């Protein structure tokens, strides 16, 4: 400060950098003149951190240096135009209240340099004329000091990074292995691993059944369809003798042959008296080829018993080698291979059953199961009785009960 009472700048930045063994703070009350505001480009740049409020280029009258003003310093200052920033403050003086010297390490395009960090200041209204100054970081002594500081910084960084003990290194390796194992378990849980097939192999029967697409396939061996010559002659002679007699018969049930052959069946319905033959007899039904011989459908029951229960023996014609599919259809349609006719001798050879215990020639039973006598001939009712029957009204319950009794008797007769 001069004798006229005006504020005067004195050089102190270079001496602070070169004289400080440890980068200490300058004395309180030092003056700096603002050369450029934060928006004015300069030869170098100070670090830009979140706490940075403004970056200025300041001078002590001899050397210039970068000055970083923190955000907290701007907020706590009494500067009235702080909302407008440092634009237009060139030539004004900064009164430093809290300041420190820092080193900027070279990174990206920013060179290494010394700079000042201002934590508290006061902007004076006094303006100083512009004077040509040199950059403090361009001085040779300052460059030498900067290199020494950078070497010390690098050595401290290397020693701090190389200070891991063996136990710390093992802990790092263990944590890395645990992390890797967790990643492997997570990857396995996300994958669907398919191991070797342990299922039992399919049999030929299951394989052929799956290839049949759900259709039932039946196979009959050719040996089962062959009839020995002796049996063939007996059956042929029996059939020819029965045909000569002109006897027509139809069995209600046919037992399965021991050979298990699958042949066409010829069935006919028989009536009890010749008078009802033409009206109640149904045409013969031809059965289709199947693995097992099926029993013909029992004829419907009339008011009087009309079914003939016969013991029959099959009459078979000689079988030739198995025809083709279209030939087998024509054979079934043209000539049946098996006819059921009455044979008393054949009935004696087969095991006796309840149906075969009846006589070969059907005779009307004399008594009911309850030992009451059958009555086949009835007198003509009188006219008065006929009129009474017509005028009688039966209740629905009684009609249903009678119908149930009739149906039960018909089912029992059919089963026999």
UniProtKB/Swiss-Prot annotation:
Native source organism of the sequence: Mus musculus
More details: Adrenocortical dysplasia mouse was initially reported as a model of human congenital adrenal hypoplasia (AHC).
Keywords, ordered alphabetically: Chromosome, DNA-binding, Isopeptide bond, Nucleus, Phosphoprotein, Telomere, Ubl conjugation
UniProt-annotated location(s): Nucleus; Chromosome, Telomere
Motif (PWI): 11-13
Function text: Component of the shelterin complex (telosome) that is involved in the regulation of telomere length and protection. Shelterin associates with arrays of double-stranded TTAGGG repeats added by telomerase and protects chromosome ends. Without its protective activity, telomeres are no longer hidden from the DNA damage surveillance and chromosome ends are inappropriately processed by DNA repair pathways. Promotes binding of POT1 to single-stranded telomeric DNA. Modulates the inhibitory effects of POT1 on telomere elongation.
Listed Pfam families: TPP1
Gene Ontology biological process terms from the UniProt entry: embryonic limb morphogenesis; establishment of protein localization to telomere; intracellular protein transport; negative regulation of telomere maintenance via telomerase; positive regulation of telomere maintenance; protection from non-homologous end joining at telomere; regulation of establishment of protein localization to telomere; segmentation
Entry protein name: Adrenocortical dysplasia protein
GO CC annotation, single: nuclear body
Tagged with keyword Ion transport: no
Crosslinked residue numbers (Glycyl lysine isopeptide (Lys-Gly) (interchain with G-Cter in SUMO2)): 345
Bias kind Low complexity: ranges: 259-272
Tissue/organ expression: Ubiquitous.
In-chain residues carrying the UniProt-annotated modification Phosphoserine: 25, 313, 317
GO terms for MF: DNA polymerase binding; protein-containing complex binding; telomerase inhibitor activity; telomeric DNA binding
Keyword GTP-binding: no
Subunit details: Component of the shelterin complex (telosome) composed of TERF1, TERF2, TINF2, TERF2IP ACD and POT1. Forms heterodimers with POT1. Identified in a complex with POT1 and single-stranded telomeric DNA. Interacts with STN1 and TINF2.
Region called Disordered, residue ranges: 234-306
């Amino acid at each position: 400060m001069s004798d006229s009472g005006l504020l005067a700048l004195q050089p102190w930045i270079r001496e602070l950098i070169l004289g400080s063994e440890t980068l200490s703070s300058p004395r309180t009350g030092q003056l700096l003149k603002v050369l450029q505001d934060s928006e004015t480009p300069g030869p170098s740049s100070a670090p830009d951190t979140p706490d940075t409020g403004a970056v200025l280029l300041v001078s002590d009258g001899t050397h210039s240096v970068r000055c970083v003003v923190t955000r907290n310093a701007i907020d706590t200052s009494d500067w009235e135009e702080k909302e407008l920033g440092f634009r237009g403050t060139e030539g004004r003086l900064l009164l430093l209240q809290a300041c420190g010297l820092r080193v900027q390490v070279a990174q990206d395009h920013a060179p290494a340099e010394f700079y000042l960090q201002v934590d508290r200041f006061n902007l004076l209204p006094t303006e100083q004329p512009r004077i040509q100054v040199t950059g403090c970081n361009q001085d040779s002594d300052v460059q030498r000091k900067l290199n020494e500081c950078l070497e010390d910084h690098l050595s401290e960084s290397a020693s701090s990074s190389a200070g891991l003990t063996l136990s710390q290194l093992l802990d790092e390796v263990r944590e890395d292995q645990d992390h890797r194992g967790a990643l492997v378990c997570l990857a396995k849980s996300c994958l669907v691993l398919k191991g070797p097939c342990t299922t039992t192999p399919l049999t030929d029967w299951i394989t052929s059944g799956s290839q049949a697409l759900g259709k039932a396939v039946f196979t009959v061996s050719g040996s089962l369809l062959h009839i020995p010559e002796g049996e063939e002659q007996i059956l042929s002679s029996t059939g020819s003798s029965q045909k000569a007699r002109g006897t027509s018969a139809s069995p209600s049930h046919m037992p399965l042959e021991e050979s298990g052959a699958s042949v066409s069946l010829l069935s006919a319905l028989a009536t009890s008296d010749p008078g009802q033959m033409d009206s109640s007899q149904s045409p013969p039904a031809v059965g289709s080829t199947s693995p097992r011989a099926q029993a013909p459908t029992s004829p419907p029951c009339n008011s009087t018993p009309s079914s003939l229960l016969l013991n029959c023996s099959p009459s078979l014609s000689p079988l030739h080698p198995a025809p083709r599919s279209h030939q087998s259809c024509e054979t079934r349609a043209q000539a049946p291979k098996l006819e059921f006719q009455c044979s008393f001798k054949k009935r004696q050879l087969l095991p006796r059953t309840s149906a075969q215990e009846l006589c070969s020639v059907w005779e009307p039973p004399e008594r009911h199961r309850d030992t009451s006598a059958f009555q086949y001939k009835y007198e003509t009712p009188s006219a008065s009785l006929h009129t009474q029957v017509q005028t009688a009204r039966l209740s629905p319950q009684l009609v249903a009960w009678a119908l149930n009794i009739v149906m039960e008797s018909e089912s029992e007769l059919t089963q026999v």
